[in-house]
């Protein structure tokens, strides 16, 4: 790796940020499958688009169709999945974007890795907190049913651990509130934290 150097661009991250009129950052949604991460990230992206913000949503399922299509779901593969996503998110932040990510990202260490990669001022952890029973009841993809039947191994919340964030920047309880109300909570918290 000693022959590889980082190429400095003539247009800086700050210049890109100023051109877009926004502060680039990553809004990292984490929580169990079925907690509402993708739904909330998508709704927040729509709200930010209405405000003229330049965004991109990296969704766990979509990323596994390409960038991380070669990975499985054991602990090592999950960690590599999040490492890759973190690197892509960092490049997008450098481009001046507000990046929303929706990944179970079950391990604190992998989320901290991404936080450290970006820096504390460019990483907002959003814990979408829904009880396991609620997630199983929702089960939009039928994955909990398959995991309970033994058809899926290493499924977070069933036979693989989820390590809830200890101090997320934003903690959303999602056990029945309308999506619009949760997006309002998100926007308020992001503004109060000077992230937007």
UniProtKB/Swiss-Prot annotation:
Pathway noted in the entry: Sulfur metabolism; hydrogen sulfide biosynthesis; sulfite from sulfate: step 2/3
CDD domains in the record: APSK
Biological process (GO), any one: sulfate assimilation
EC number: 2.7.1.25
InterPro entries, A to Z: APS_kinase, P-loop_NTPase
Gene Ontology molecular functions: adenylylsulfate kinase activity; ATP binding
Binding residues for ATP: 31-38
PANTHER family, per database record: ADENYLYL-SULFATE KINASE 1, CHLOROPLASTIC, BIFUNCTIONAL 3'-PHOSPHOADENOSINE 5'-PHOSPHOSULFATE SYNTHASE
Biological role stated in the UniProt entry: Catalyzes the synthesis of activated sulfate.
Family as reported in the entry's similarity comment: Belongs to the APS kinase family.
Protein name: Adenylyl-sulfate kinase
Natural source organism: Aeromonas salmonicida (strain A449)
Lineage of the organism: Bacteria, Pseudomonadati, Pseudomonadota, Gammaproteobacteria, Aeromonadales
Gene: cysC
